[in-house]
Amino acid sequence: MKYIGAHVSAAGGLANAPARAAEIGATAFALFTKNQRQWRAAPLTPQVIDDFKIACEKYHFSAAQILPHDSYLINLGHPVSEALEKSRDAFLDEMQRCEQLGLTLLNFHPGSHLMQIAQEDCLARIAESINIALAQTEGVTAVIENTAGQGSNLGFEFEQLAAIIDGVEDKSRVGVCIDTCHAFAAGYDLRTPEACEKTFAEFGKIVGFQYLRGMHLNDAKSAFGSRVDRHHSLGEGNIGHDAFRWIMQDARFDGIPLILETINPDIWAEEIAWLKAQQIAEAMA
């Protein structure tokens, strides 16, 4: 079964996120558990935690259908020790918030070497950052998102994702989230079913589908291989509809949150309905 949704706002309280997801016909959702552009946040109160859990139950969202995202400020591969510690502390806080909320996944961007350390050293720092957080939490999987490779961001090649996983001690609590826009911008073609087959065969060989814990379904304004991260609505960008139809009809993408981060929230309900319809089309074929 496919879990399909979008990254919804938690404005006004975390308990509003499940309601907003239900309003657009979603069977999955992503959210920030705190302001994504600030380092610090007030601790979660028992009331906030209870309200969120009650709302998830009310709208039938289990932890497997929810993909929280961490702060954009965090860089787990930071070349400067003091800044690295700040990121590690913030990441641990994000993991602990998920733990408190009963969530089992935390999606994050791996990090950037900022042109100051070697790529291999940065990847090792990211893996060690994950190890530090996993050692102090329970039940939450660290889900590494592939990047477009913009600037000095790492995680744009499957080999880089595999290298990070290789450095994580508890393999049962690390996974990846594949963003289709990022993959396309990084040079992984998705424009035809044949291209999708090839790209995901490569993913399966290098990373492994056992580590796939979520996806971001985004078309791309950016050109193929451009290393530029610019999302678009489904079918309106340079990837086109075929990739998303193909994903909906492949059982390897069952049971994980498939999250829209497309540019027009006003049509998320339509995009979710279209994605669901592709599943039905396959079932009837």
From Swiss-Prot:
User: Which class of enzymes does this protein belong to?
Assistant: hydrolase
- The entry marks the following residues as binding Zn(2+) 2, namely E145, D179, H216, E261
Where on the tree of life does the source sit, at the highest rank?
Bacteria
Its Enzyme Commission number(s) read 3.1.21.2
Q: Which UniProt keywords apply?
A: DNA damage, DNA repair, Endonuclease, Hydrolase, Metal-binding, Nuclease, Zinc
Which GO BP terms, alphabetically? base-excision repair
Named cofactor requirement(s): Zn(2+)
Please give the family membership noted in the entry: Belongs to the AP endonuclease 2 family.
- What is this protein's name? Probable endonuclease 4
Natural source organism: Salmonella typhi
The encoding gene: nfo
